[in-house]
Amino acid sequence: MKVQFLGVGDQFSAHDQYHSNMVITAGSGAKMLVDCGSDVKYSLMECKINPTDIDAVYISHLHADHVGGLEWLALKTYFGGENKRLKLFCEEKLQSDLWHNSLKGGLECIGIKCMELSDYFDCYPLTEGGGFDWQGIQFELVKMPHVMGGGCNMYSYGLLAGTADKENSLFISTDTQFQPGLIENIAERAALIFHDCETSAVKSTVHAHYEQLLTLPASVKNKIWLYHYQRDSKYCPHQDGFLGFVLKGQEFTFTDIS
């Protein structure tokens, strides 16, 4: 299995970083897009990935840097001449909200009929705390607090990836606040962690900040690659015990996951 970062930046990133979306390539060659932000058509092109090569999409939460490109992807594949519906994996309530709050306005009326999400995607609503199998890879959803308070909470669903007969080898946090206890527990199961990391001078409180992640035990930090950061960071992750900042376009290979 391979994981390639189409981008490594935040909501406000430009072409030098792109949004923090990824492509997972299974041993079979099938590709799954992990989140689909507003700039995905450009980041895919830069990585020489044709949208028609994508087999599935996983959505972690509804911010535009994670779903803003889905309307484009839905129309691109629907009218692409191959009559192809991508598999769509996301938590069940999130899947309903994705259609009614994010996509319906642009995708319902296309001059043929009143369209539904299932006209564009082969939908797989997932139970909270559940998981799914894709191309022989087992994925487990991990509920992460992202924007909390004020009577309106937003969670993002991270992914643990592995195989049925082996320990989980990979964790992708997606967008999350700092959760030290949870990350320490996950580090006992995962050989490698890709973690949301804010590096701005002003802490937003909705993303784990570098200075918070710095307090994790060395045995956890040495498993962590940092992404979703701001440009021109003053921090030196290698010196601080992390594996580093993921670079735009960087690819990781996992030989123990098919």
Map each language-model feature to its residues.
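Phosphate- and divalent-cation-binding pockets in alpha/beta enzyme and binding domains
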Residues: 42-43, 66-69, 97-98, 181, ...
